[in-house]
A protein has these predicted regions:
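Solvent-exposed, non-transmembrane regions of integral membrane proteins
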Residues: 1-264
Length: 264
């Protein structure tokens, strides 16, 4: 194993899910039965939280400024993601324990805290653990010809479990001839669908097909179009996490003034 580039493909489903559950179970056990250990006490300290936030933001800043997304797959980045999730999980468990230990009823639980923190954990965790299952392939759909071969971004070929056939292609243009919009009528696994730019077809749960290009010189006479198959089976978990964060932010916005008024 290279120290920098992790073999991400090795951790595809179900291994990534098993590892995620094992890590979750281990952290819960440590918090319940080894709460006074040096490791747990550090993870619950303000220093651990500051380090987690700063390292995560620094990683995001480096990736955003350099544009090198492959950095996310490096060993240091993996350790930062694991550390961030671990600290966040311990903070959530401590917050939940404080709520239940005081005998708080369900309606009195700080849902703002739980929704925000659990939402971040779910969004980051699904992106991290689901990365090995994510993939993007390009297909050259040919007019009236069944195609099953696709290509990864590194140029290697792969076979998809269904056929794609280009049936028709249309280009709408401005008066000066500049393309305004283009769409392709494609047969996908026996089903005829219409693909437009930024209007993908959901072939299955977590798999979308996008129209990304065509023969610009031939226009509507193009004998092929370029499709991109994006596989992100964990994206719905990330969406749920984002919704939880939005709900937590709304509760924070609604409940904040009331809490301040009570203190006054």
């Amino acid at each position: 194993m290279d120290f920098i580039d992790m073999p991400v493909s090795f951790f595809t489903f179900p291994l990534n899910l098993i590892l995620a559950l094992l890590c979750l179970g281990l952290m819960v056990w440590l918090y319940k039965d080894r709460r006074k250990s040096v490791f747990v006490r550090f993870m619950l300290s303000p220093s651990a939280t500051i380090i987690a936030i700063c390292s995560f933001l620094l990683l995001a800043l480096i990736v955003g400024c350099t544009g090198k997304r492959e950095i996310v797959g490096s060993l240091p980045s993996v350790l930062i993601f694991l550390y961030f999730q671990t600290v966040l999980l311990f903070v959530i468990m401590r917050g939940w324990r404080h709520q239940t230990a005081t005998g708080a009823r369900l309606g009195a639980v700080r849902w703002r805290f739980l929704l925000n923190h659990a939402g971040i954990l779910l969004a980051v965790g699904s992106a991290f653990w689901g990365a090995p299952d994510s993939d993007a392939l390009r297909v050259r759909a040919i007019r009236d010809v069944a195609v099953k071969e696709a290509f990864h971004m590194d140029g290697t070929s792969s076979w998809i479990p269904y056929e794609i056939i280009l049936k028709d292609f249309k280009v709408d243009r401005y008066e000066d001839g500049t393309p305004l919009m283009y769409e392709a009528v494609v047969d996908v696994d026996g089903k005829e669908v219409i693909l437009r730019v930024n209007s993908p077809y959901s072939h299955s749960l977590g798999e979308d097909i996008y129209l990304v290009g065509y023969d610009s010189l031939a226009g509507e006479s193009s004998q092929y179009c370029i499709l991109e198959i994006v596989r992100e089976p964990w994206k719905y978990a990330a969406v749920i996490g984002i919704i939880m964060m939005i709900a937590g932010a709304l509760l924070l916005f609604i409940g904040g003034p009331a809490r301040r008024n009570e203190r006054e």
